[in-house]
């Protein structure tokens, strides 16, 4: 557990922003004032960050050392809508579970607020769960989905990962960039411990999105994992099979969904690899449907 927190601290220690000034706002959605930023122009894509993260810490190259600014790269050809989900960053917490289902409903309401009929969605970790639920609960709003490191059932994670979450405390983040950024951005800067406990209480609940519901989703999905991710390898392949994977594309039609497993990558370290992942994402999002 201490190792995970240390890695997160190191990753967040060089927060930088070389962004051109975006359009920003707060959307009234489901009892939230949800903070969002819009960068660039083109086909819309929504970015959903991971637990304890913000737009800056997840997407705008916070780690320095030449790592890729996801928003800068994606907004070269797309309208990027980056949000801060319930309790994170500039979006205050409210009295409800911080669950993928609730977060997905917020994304749907945000798109309504912005008068965007549908969008591609990229979600990392907790944001990946919200992206999955967008495809399940709001299929009319979703074109394609990129899921970076999430499982659609609790048992899709390795035991060590499930065992670690209940042990997270606000004290573990004391003095860290995660705590510092929360206190800098949050409308309730003195509520960091409450936020950690609330997020933990939501995250430790067993969940199952349902294989049948997952299989029935219409949106093509691109699953991206590290080979030391914390998601079980069997679960990665199960998700891909549910979306039509595990075929010989040389001998017949292949799935419009995709799977990538990056070597030598952990759950956290995946976000170092934007220079590898973003071109694959762009290719996936730009690919024409075989049904067109």
Residue ranges and their predicted role:
Residues 101-119:
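Conserved acidic catalytic loop of the alpha/beta-hydrolase fold
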Residues 217, 223-225:
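Short beta-strand/loop motif that positions the catalytic acidic residue
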Residues 227-265, 273:
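Conserved loop-alpha-helix segment in the C-terminal half of the alpha/beta-hydrolase fold
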Residues 32-90:
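Conserved HGGG/HGGXW glycine-rich cap/lid loop of the alpha/beta-hydrolase fold
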Residues 129-137, 143-179:
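Flexible "cap/lid" loop of the alpha/beta hydrolase fold
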Residues 119, 123-125:
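Conserved alpha/beta-hydrolase "nucleophile elbow" surrounding the catalytic nucleophile
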Residues 255-292:
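Catalytic active-site module of serine/aspartate enzymes centered on a nucleophile-bearing elbow/loop
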Residues 197-213:
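Active-site nucleophile elbow and catalytic-triad environment of alpha/beta-hydrolase enzymes
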């Amino acid at each position: 557990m201490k190792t995970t927190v240390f890695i997160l601290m190191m990753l967040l220690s060089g927060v930088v922003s070389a962004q051109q000034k975006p359009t920003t706002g707060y959307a009234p959605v489901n009892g939230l004032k949800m903070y969002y930023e819009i960068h660039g122009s083109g086909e819309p894509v929504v970015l959903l960050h991971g637990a304890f993260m913000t737009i800056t810490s997840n997407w705008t190259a916070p780690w320095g050392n030449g790592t890729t600014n996801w928003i800068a790269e994606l907004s070269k050809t797309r309208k990027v809508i980056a949000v801060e989900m319930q309790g994170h960053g500039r979006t205050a917490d409210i009295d409800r579970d911080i669950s993928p289902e609730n977060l997905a409903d917020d994304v749907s309401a945000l798109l309504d607020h912005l008068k965007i009929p549908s969008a591609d969605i990229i979600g990392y970790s907790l944001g990946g769960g919200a992206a999955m639920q967008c495809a399940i609960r709001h299929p009319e709003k979703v074109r394609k989905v990129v899921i970076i490191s999430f499982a659609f059932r609790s048992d899709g994670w390795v035991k060590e990962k499930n065992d670690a979450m209940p042990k997270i405390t606000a004290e573990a983040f004391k003095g860290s960039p995660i705590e510092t950024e929360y206190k800098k951005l949050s409308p309730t800067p003195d509520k960091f411990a409450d936020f950690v406990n609330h997020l933990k209480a939501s995250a430790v609940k067993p969940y199952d999105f349902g294989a049948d519901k997952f299989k029935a989703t219409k949106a093509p999905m691109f699953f991206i994992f590290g080979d030391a991710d914390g998601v079980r390898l069997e679960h990665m392949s199960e998700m891909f099979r549910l979306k039509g994977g595990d075929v010989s594309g040389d001998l017949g039609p292949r799935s419009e969904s995709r799977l990538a497993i990056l070597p030598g990558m952990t759950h956290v370290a995946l976000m170092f690899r934007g220079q590898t992942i973003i071109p694959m994402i762009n290719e996936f999002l730009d690919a024409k449907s075989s049904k067109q």
